[in-house]
Amino acid sequence: MSKESSFDIVSKVDLSEVTNAINIALKEIKNRYDFKGSKSDISLDKDELVLISDDEFKLEQLKDVLIGKLIRRGVPTKNIQYGKIEPAAGGTVRQRAKLVQGIDKENAKKINTIIKNTGLKVKSQVQDDQIRVSGKSKDDLQKVIAAIREADLPIDVQFVNYR
């Protein structure tokens, strides 16, 4: 009598770590010489980042500082989708960036295709914004995890509830 093992594939961003990274980035910007007198700011509204700066060059520098801090805090930067740069009030420019939470249908199909192409005896089911993979052999499940990690997906995925 063999019991089935399973794990879930999710794509989540820890918002508390994002908030910490924003605070550290703002502290660095306040102390940097090239940002003296600048109206640069980063804010977080639910699952959207808003970057504001004097011009596009400073906005790119602001984005580089933020990405560095996010990486240091362990936040996946693949899950950030940047919008276009738009003019804002007071001669500044703004850019919105959406934090992607969960796996959408398109990426779920890609992941399911990767799982099917392994040829292993595992089943995968899409459950809302996550995918559950189950099979009798834990070795097969680990091979599926390795195959998904090797694939170049547009989002960062985590593996949880390994049973």
Swiss-Prot record:
Nucleotide-binding protein. Belongs to the YajQ family. GO terms for cellular component: cytosol. SUPFAM superfamilies: YajQ-like. The keyword Protease does not apply. InterPro entries: DUF520, UPF0234-like_C, UPF0234_N, YajQ-like_sf. CDD domains: YajQ_like (cd11740). It comes from Geobacillus sp. (strain WCH70). The lineage of its organism: Bacteria, Bacillati, Bacillota, Bacilli, Bacillales. It comes from the Bacteria. This is Nucleotide-binding protein GWCH70_0711. One of its GO terms (molecular function) is nucleotide binding. Keywords: Nucleotide-binding.
